[in-house]
Amino acid sequence: MAKFSRISLISFFIIISAAVANAQVNAVEFGKNRVQFKKFKWYYYQTKNFNVYYYQNGEELAKFIAQSAEKELPQMESAAEYSLQRRANIILYNEYADMQQSNIGLGIDWQNNGGTKLVNNKMVVYFEADHQKLRLQVRKGIAQILTENRLFGDDIGEIAGNQALLDLPKWLTDGYISYLGQNWSTELDDELKSEILSGNYTKFSKFAFARPQIAGHAFWYFIEEKYKKENVTYLLYLATLYKNLNKACLKECKKKFKEVLVEFMEYQDEKYYRDI
């Protein structure tokens, strides 16, 4: 059963990160400019698997997020073949400007790329006057929590050790998170087609360097198309098991990792150039 509670501002920042415990939340000076902060009175809405933290005028959005997250979680756990280990925290801002100003001086740089932010296993989302976009942010946040917990654990010490041992390309893990959080769509297909037909990329490495998220998402969708959907998460599992992408690809694709990337480029060229 869901429940509401109020928390103090100090408690809220402890929940977000121990690093912000000494932060000033009323005003910060940058040279001659002074930035005024809103003062938020924080509450949280709790469900079986999520705590949604919100402030004034955010209660209905918090309910929407909590219900959406609970609805999406079982399907995403099934696709990831991994379950949420503990209740996840979602920090909700009513608008992007509030999210920006609340973190000035805290050493966190929010970039306006329309995506979910993850801070120490806590999802930070903001409302863009579009509930579908908010739901997508939540899906991507769940995908990121599930993926990173599975790959690296959810303890800070465990994460650091596992990241050192498991040296996967960032485009690969970010692409899997995007794949898990957002179904392939006409918009994504058009974006990929535009990149492939641009003629800018003769090798996948150049494509992944320039456009890591679409390249990574497209790679996993390619694995689904070419090697079956059930083998997408299995390939990631093999990569973590062997700690070696070549061994993982040889096991599933019967090819080395670099050969799979060449196959990806050839596959996309054939698919999109035949439409010209």
Segments from the language model and where they lie:
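Extended hydrophobic/aromatic-rich secondary-structure runs
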Residues: 2-7, 100-107, 241-246
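Acidic/His/Gly-enriched intrinsically disordered linker/tail segments
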Residues: 34, 108-276
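Bacterial Sec-dependent N-terminal signal peptides
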Residues: 1-29
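Juxtacatalytic substrate-recognition/specificity segment
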Residues: 23-162, 169, 186-187
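Generic detector of short, well-ordered, non-transmembrane alpha-helical segments enriched
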Residues: 17-19, 72, 173, 216
